[in-house]
């Protein structure tokens, strides 16, 4: 019985040490550029390491109006971190996106559900298109201090009729 308790105690200590290496979190912000509406955006992100190399990153970006078009973009991406140096990690990414495109069209009110998007026309001359799509791309993390990282990311959003590249420069605080 004593050997079993010692074994279980050691197993608990080892598993808690392994768990401590996982679960690293970060919260950050970024500046983005999208090619479809040619606009600059501001974003917030949260990062959670499921395992040491696998990271989950939900993010929210708002792209400033350009030629009467603005966009709100919600993403859920998965990164696989590959260290290439002491302070640099490269990662491919795959994820999903929900984007809301807002622009002026004309008068009228209309709601259409067409496959993968919702089309809304309102009486106030604003038009919204909500679409769901897939993100593919990659990025690089650069360690600035023990808690701060900088990243550069390029992803391509495959969204029906709204495919676009997104360039992002961001900073995150790890805790």
Describe each model-derived feature in a short phrase.
Residues 1-24:
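Cleavable N-terminal export/targeting peptides
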Residues 26-29, 117-124, 151-154:
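Extracytoplasmic loops and strand-loop junctions of Gram-negative outer membrane beta-barrel proteins
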